[in-house]
């Protein structure tokens, strides 16, 4: 009997999965959770053999949970459930120790088959797929490092310029809001573009929003 930790933020989907797993002779759902914090609490002491874990949770990512659980128990097996087709997200899950990724649109038999294969010690990915995903994860980490280095160069005044840009203000409006000349505003913007390695105000705004430099209202 394989003991399952089921982590999924949509209660109805989670309850359906639990009903399906508990109806199988070789599975038992020993703990359920709808968030990262709840999963960390409920996972303690239940002795789960494997986890069926949502990639995106309200208060974090399934990747964080997998990493924690595998650090505590190197034999813990994890299957990621996701609605995403973004390979970079899959790559991060595999790098954290997930043995496979199944889309939420998969039918019941596919989810059960994937879980049984996982319980048998199989991985759901070929060696080539694993290598490609790990390579992609490395590229993502490098991009993150470069982004953080760029962010570190942005001055408080330049952050103010970015924030007013996020509010949809024009050059003149930004200058007026921040009590500077239009030429000074343009100089700040040029410095921002250079530091972030982008070529337009729109690209700067996208970068700033992605990495939390601005608050979008």
Predicted feature residues:
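Short, conserved "switch-loop" micro-motifs in signal-transduction and mechanochemical regulators
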Residues: 83-85, 183
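Acidic catalytic/metal-coordinating carboxylates
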Residues: 35, 61-64
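Short, flexible helix-to-coil linker/hinge segments that flank and couple to helix-turn-helix
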Residues: 90-95, 100-152, 156, 160, ...
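Recognition helix of helix-turn-helix DNA-binding domains
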Residues: 168-203
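Conserved acidic carboxylate
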Residues: 8
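Short amphipathic alpha-helix used as the core "switch/output" element in two-component signaling
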Residues: 63-75
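Active-site residues of response regulator receiver
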Residues: 54-56, 82
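Acidic, metal-coordinating helix/loop segments flanking the phosphotransfer/catalytic sites
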Residues: 32-50
